[in-house]
Amino acid sequence: MARITVEDCLKQIPNRFELALAATYRARQLAQGHTPKIESRDKPTVVALREIASGLVGVEMLKKVPV
């Protein structure tokens, strides 16, 4: 499997801080049992980054975070 890099993800979410927040929130969702949007056997963090790099998850993820 190809490696996922931050540069791949930055094409979808150009702000590094928003990228980190979106990836963290999505990884927590996956760890809690949410269905992944891609087929993968990787850890939740890697799956979250792959979803972001492929454009399936974006900055809109931050609007779902409970305050």
Swiss-Prot record:
Keyword hit for Iron: no
Enzyme Commission number, as recorded: 2.7.7.6
Molecular function as annotated in GO: DNA binding; DNA-directed RNA polymerase activity
One Pfam family it belongs to: RNA_pol_Rpb6
Domain of life: Bacteria
Coiled-coil ranges from the UniProt annotation: none
GO biological process terms on file: DNA-templated transcription
Catalytic activity line of the entry: RNA(n) + a ribonucleoside 5'-triphosphate = RNA(n+1) + diphosphate
Keywords per UniProt: DNA-directed RNA polymerase, Nucleotidyltransferase, Transcription, Transferase
UniProt GO cellular component terms: DNA-directed RNA polymerase complex
Signal peptide interval: none
Entry similarity comment: Belongs to the RNA polymerase subunit omega family.
HAMAP family given in the database record: RNApol_bact_RpoZ
Function, in words: Promotes RNA polymerase assembly. Latches the N- and C-terminal regions of the beta' subunit thereby facilitating its interaction with the beta and alpha subunits.
Assembly information from the UniProt record: The RNAP catalytic core consists of 2 alpha, 1 beta, 1 beta' and 1 omega subunit. When a sigma factor is associated with the core the holoenzyme is formed, which can initiate transcription.
Protein name: DNA-directed RNA polymerase subunit omega
Species assigned in the record: Burkholderia ambifaria (strain ATCC BAA-244 / DSM 16087 / CCUG 44356 / LMG 19182 / AMMD)
Taxonomic classification: Bacteria, Pseudomonadati, Pseudomonadota, Betaproteobacteria, Burkholderiales
